[in-house]
Amino acid sequence: VAKVVNAALGRMAVPFFACVTGYFLTKHEKKDSRGWIKNIKSLLSYYVVFSVIYIIWGFTQHEFAGLSAGDLIYTIVKRFVMYGTYYHLWFFPCMILGVVILHFAIKWKREKIFWIIGILCYVFGACTYTWYGIGEHFILGLDRLMQWFDFTYIHRFTTAILPFTFLGNYISAVEN
């Protein structure tokens, strides 16, 4: 039972959250073009609080020991913008980017293009998850790309956030 909860149900939370965000943001964008800013402010308010907590935690665990002041600032900023300040906060920067992309897709009336891009991203992501290893046989150089640390976070965005944000957008569009 624990395996089912962790491997299946637990992995649906972030895509579900992205889908719901895409759905409601699409509805709000039609009424108030500043809805995306409110959404980002809300995400940032939680993200900043949890980031401060985990940065302090990192200091107590000597995670930053030996870093110069410049390297320390660079590390914290890069984590905040790209990875999440702690490994399980990765979805905050990804979701913020998803909200920004959705806003401009709606504003420039390019949602249908992003529905296709979202599907392609999802297929690419499904082929590149390491426990399947399918993509390594068909996509040249993928094994090297997957060893690049940043790829994990790009992969999560293109697989769990962008496609599902635009799925929510699609559901909202079909509903209206």
Could you tell me what each predicted segment is?
Residues 1, 138-146:
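Membrane-interface interhelical loops and short amphipathic "cap" helices
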Residues 2-67:
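Membrane helical hairpin/interfacial module
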Residues 2-5, 164, 176:
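Short intrinsically disordered, low-complexity coil segments enriched in acidic
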Residues 10, 17-18, 24-26, 54-62, ...:
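Hydrophobic alpha-helical segments with transmembrane-like composition
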Residues 34-43, 111-118, 176:
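Membrane-interfacial loop-to-transmembrane alpha-helix junctions, especially the N-terminal start
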Residues 35, 68-72, 140:
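Coil-to-alpha-helix initiation sites in intrinsically disordered, low-complexity, charged segments
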